[in-house]
């Protein structure tokens, strides 16, 4: 009689399977590295003997054809693989035998391409990613083993307590209390043992529930590893190999076609074979050969001892098991909403970084690539967490818990936030806001979202029209500065907007005195540069209301007489029109700081165009008094407050929404929004803002 098979721990079995996978993968990569090295060696020797004819080429191709890996019959059975393409090229070399002097340089360049070191670097990178994913799976299996061990211990303690309680009860029923115990003491002992048995039963129930939850989570993780992560990693390795093998093989084929007319048929066949190489088919055949990359059987629940319960139990009213499972549902639904937001935000950050990488210099490329890897790793962790959480929630729902009660609000809130970000993205893209600052803020938001699972709530700002900076602006509402970096403005004043603010609804501007600060954007009116506005000038000695234009001082100037203006560098000067038939003597007339005078025109730069004759101005025309902007400050929120309970649309299904292309940059506001004006200003009776 043969002994029963030895029992192997689940963690040890999974670990051995992973080690075997790594070993076979390294062997496969080594064969491909040898093939790449063969191609480089072939090109180097071909460049040296290209000037010779006939037998030299045959002697060159002979050693490569005699290699064990290339002369075996597996080349024909594997079909359209890189090995078959390589064999076809060698046959074309043997059949040809003609040389071309101009092909020598091309072979020499091909020999200096990427070699074994680059292939080993690709293998090392892919192996690290695979080992990281395998370590996470092993951790899940170890957690399952620990919970199963605890479950077995609790079951043994509970069974022992049951036996003791049953023994005392039997003695009590037989009145067999002996000489050392009375009936009263036996009754007390029976009561005590019954209480202990009930307590151990609750502990057994909690341990069994934890075991079941870890069981479904581990199975889901294993399935995700074999269905998603492992094929993705292997596909990445194959794509890297294709970049190193496709170009050399294609170059060899083209060189043969151009070098000799007599071997045109053989060279053309080699080119077709190379272009028809199916990397997906090669990968599929490789996965079918070893047999170790097939998914492992799912883990099954193994009851301990005499316990035959294999489902979640959440007990009656008042039992600790009920509150524990409900808390578990709340935690899992919150985690599901967080994973959903992390994945959507992560894909948006990936798109931004990909655009930035295409335009980045060689010095910035490594840092951007590192950021891309970090974001991809965060998205992958969120996907794994989502798969495990979905399995747990499905089991909890099957046990009778109302999962929809917490899941729908959580997912609805997450989708609302994603929709808000999509609208913000459309507003940003309409302004072509693709600056590195916006991308850095996007990445910072993603990192904070990954750590806390919370996104800052802010109202979607109104999309602003694209305008070139700096540009002039007319103040239509007064504003008193509330911070040191803000600027106090008065109604009717002209400003120069020099840059966007550090938050929405704020811009940085410079007044006529050269002072710079942040002002509310909705308190300003940006005139059309092609249609200059007209304004009143109370200091005009002629009594007419000329059309006002702006000019910015390029240099500071001190007036040489009482008629001349003095102004600092950067000041905004309002130009007054000259006579229609006047001669430009190099001095313009303008107003600055409440004074009217002349100044050299070479010291300023026009902002609104040349001043026109007096007949073009309308004395009755003035800037209209606009109505207050439709704005209501957002309700105060705190980043410490968690997001409201999300909602999942749909019926009773527990599937999560797909990841949409909602690419929306979000800039975290650094200052509160400006207060709204109470009403439109009255030119005759100005009131302060409230």
Curated annotation (Swiss-Prot):
One of its GO terms (biological process) is inflammatory response. Keywords: Cell projection, Coiled coil, Cytoplasm, Cytoplasmic vesicle, Lipid-binding, Phosphoprotein, Repeat, SH3 domain. It is found in: Cytoplasm; Perikaryon; Cell projection; Cytoplasmic vesicle. Residues 468-529, 546-609 form the SH3 domain. Residues 12-282 form the F-BAR domain. One of its GO terms (cellular component) is neuromuscular junction. Residues 422-444, 609-690 are annotated as: Disordered. Promotes actin polymerization mediated by SNX9 and WASL. Homodimer. Interacts (via F-BAR domain) with SNX9 (via SH3 domain). Interacts (via F-BAR domain) with SNX18 and SNX33. Interacts (via SH3 domain 1) with WASL. Interacts (via SH3 domain 2) with ITSN1. This is F-BAR and double SH3 domains protein 1.
């Amino acid at each position: 009689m043969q002994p029963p098979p030895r029992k192997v721990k689940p963690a040890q079995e999974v670990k051995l399977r992973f080690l075997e996978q790594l070993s076979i993968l390294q062997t496969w990569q080594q064969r491909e590295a040898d093939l790449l090295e063969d191609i480089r060696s072939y090109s180097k020797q071909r460049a040296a003997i290209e000037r010779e004819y006939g037998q030299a080429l045959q002697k060159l191709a002979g050693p490569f054809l005699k290699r064990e890996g290339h002369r075996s019959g597996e080349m024909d059975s594997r079909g359209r693989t890189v090995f078959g393409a390589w064999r076809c090229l060698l046959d074309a070399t043997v059949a040809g035998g003609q040389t071309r002097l101009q092909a020598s340089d091309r072979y020499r360049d091909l020999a200096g391409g990427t070699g074994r070191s680059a292939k080993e670097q690709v293998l090392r990178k892919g192996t690290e990613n695979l080992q990281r994913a395998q370590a996470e799976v092993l951790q899940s299996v170890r957690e399952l083993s620990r919970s199963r061990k605890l479950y077995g211990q609790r079951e043994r303690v509970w069974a022992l307590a049951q036996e003791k309680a049953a023994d005392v009860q039997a003695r009590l029923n037989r009145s067999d209390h002996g000489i050392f115990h009375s009936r009263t003491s036996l009754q007390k002992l029976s009561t005590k043992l019954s209480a202990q048995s009930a307590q151990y039963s609750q502990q057994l129930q909690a341990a069994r529930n934890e075991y079941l939850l870890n069981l479904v989570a581990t199975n889901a993780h294993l399935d995700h590893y074999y269905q998603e992560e492992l094929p993705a990693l292997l596909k990445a390795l194959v794509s890297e190999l294709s970049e190193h093998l496709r170009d050399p093989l294609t170059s060899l084929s083209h060189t043969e076609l151009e070098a000799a007319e007599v071997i045109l048929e053989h060279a053309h066949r080699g080119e077709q074979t190379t272009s028809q190489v199916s990397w997906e088919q090669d990968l599929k055949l490789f996965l079918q050969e070893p047999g170790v990359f097939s998914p492992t059987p799912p883990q099954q629940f193994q009851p301990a001892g005499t316990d035959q319960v294999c489902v979640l139990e959440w007990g009656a009213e008042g039992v600790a098991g009920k509150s524990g499972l409900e808390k578990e549902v709340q935690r899992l639904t919150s985690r599901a909403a967080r994973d959903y937001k992390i994945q959507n935000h992560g894909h948006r950050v990936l798109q931004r970084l990909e655009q930035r990488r295409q335009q980045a210099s060689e010095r910035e490329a490594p840092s951007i690539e590192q950021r891309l890897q970090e974001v991809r790793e965060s998205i992958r962790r969120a996907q794994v967490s989502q798969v495990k959480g979905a399995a747990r929630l499905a089991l909890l729902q099957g046990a009778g818990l109302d999962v929809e009660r917490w899941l729908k609000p959580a997912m609805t809130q997450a989708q609302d936030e994603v929709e808000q970000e999509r609208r913000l993205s459309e507003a940003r893209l309409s302004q072509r806001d693709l600056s590195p600052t916006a991308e850095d803020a996007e990445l910072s938001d993603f990192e904070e979202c990954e750590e806390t699972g919370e996104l800052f709530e802010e109202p979607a700002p109104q999309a602003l029209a694209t305008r070139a900076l700096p540009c002039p602006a007319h103040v239509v509402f007064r504003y008193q500065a509330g911070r040191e970096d803000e600027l106090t403005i008065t109604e009717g004043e002209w400003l120069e907007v020099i840059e966007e603010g550090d938050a929405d609804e704020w811009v940085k501007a410079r007044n006529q005195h050269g002072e710079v600060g942040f002002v509310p954007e909705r308190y300003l009116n940006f005139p059309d540069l092609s249609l200059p506005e007209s304004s009143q000038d109370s200091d005009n000695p002629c009594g007419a209301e000329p059309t006002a234009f702006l000019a910015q001082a390029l240099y500071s100037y001190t007036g040489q007489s009482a008629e001349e203006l003095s102004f600092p560098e950067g000041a905004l000067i309002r130009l007054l029109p000259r006579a229609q038939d006047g001669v430009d003597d190099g001095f313009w007339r303008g107003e600055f700081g409440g004074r009217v005078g002349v100044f050299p025109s070479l010291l300023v730069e026009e902002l609104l165009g040349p001043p026109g004759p007096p007949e073009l101005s309308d004395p009755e025309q003035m800037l209209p008094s606009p109505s207050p902007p439709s704005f209501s400050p957002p309700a105060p929120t705190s980043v410490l407050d968690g997001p409201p309970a999300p909602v999942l649309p749909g019926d009773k299904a527990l599937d999560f929404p797909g990841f949409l292309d909602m690419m929306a940059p979000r800039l975290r506001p650094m200052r509160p929004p400006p207060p709204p004006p109470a009403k439109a200003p009255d030119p005759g009776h100005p009131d302060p803002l409230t």
